């Protein structure tokens, strides 16, 4: 086994299915045979626009597979382990790492962005980043552990949740639906989910949303002004005007959490900013998942999170850019598009 198939980003929309060498293992690393790899929204500019840190590059950070080889310093007992992988590789020695904040590492690497990822038959990863999975968890389900953990981290950024309160999740993509489920698992029964895609809203309702709202047909600020403001609001879509609207939807002393990344400037009206001040709103960001602990596996195993309906499209690795085009087309109502390998 000296070569493998991989999808290699060589430039904008240059996503080439080709043979490349199987990665050599460094000390502390293992070789994972990839079984499933999801497409994250952050992969889109990497593949469509060539927006990676260096070219050529292999993207893909939501994945699972089997350990098939180990490097120096790693127990051979890991061979055969079924696992997902935490993609963040913190340096371990900067000030933030020393304080137990690996997501804030200033010298981090990231599997699928700063180093080769999992849109390939094999990927080399640090053994410490393995997240073991139970035999009753499928590879496709396990590939969702990373986005599940993104949602968990986002919800936990809101602080200790108070029973009997209410929340809004703006955006009904993968992270939005997972955020809704995490809130429910933490005891928030009244979770409103807002989007413009009715098919995705219908799925959110099926999975337990208290109420779903189509923002194409409903004036969202007016709706909550009449029905009552909420305690927590989470923006997961990465849309600038939604992010600016969020303060209008929460009660005084409410909490806003921004999970979605946005490519355009976000502008707050003076009155909205005054609302933040006068209402003493808590405003925070949430950045990716975190490397340890990585609780998405337990949420999945326990049934707190259900992902089967979220994985809407599956492709062989050889499909290449077709999988991304499926994600781009609104008519497909795609949520998690995934490469699945034998």
PLM regions: where:
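Mid-domain Rossmann-like dinucleotide-binding core that forms the NAD(H)/NADP(H) cofactor-binding site
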Residues: 137-217
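NAD(P)H dinucleotide-binding glycine-rich loop of Rossmann-like/cofactor-binding domains
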Residues: 91-170
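Glycine-rich phosphate-binding loop and adjacent beta-alpha segment
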Residues: 240-302, 340-342
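Residue-level marker of beta-strand positions
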Residues: 62, 81-82, 96, 122, ...
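N-terminal Rossmann-like NAD(P) cofactor-binding module of classical short-chain dehydrogenase/reductase
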Residues: 84, 231-234
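Short amphipathic alpha-helix with an adjacent loop that forms part of the alpha/beta core around
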Residues: 218-228
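C-terminal hydrophobic helical "lid"/dimerization subdomain
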Residues: 2-4, 244-248, 290-342
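Glycine-rich beta-strand-centered segment in the early N-terminal region that forms part
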Residues: 23-37, 50-95, 134-136
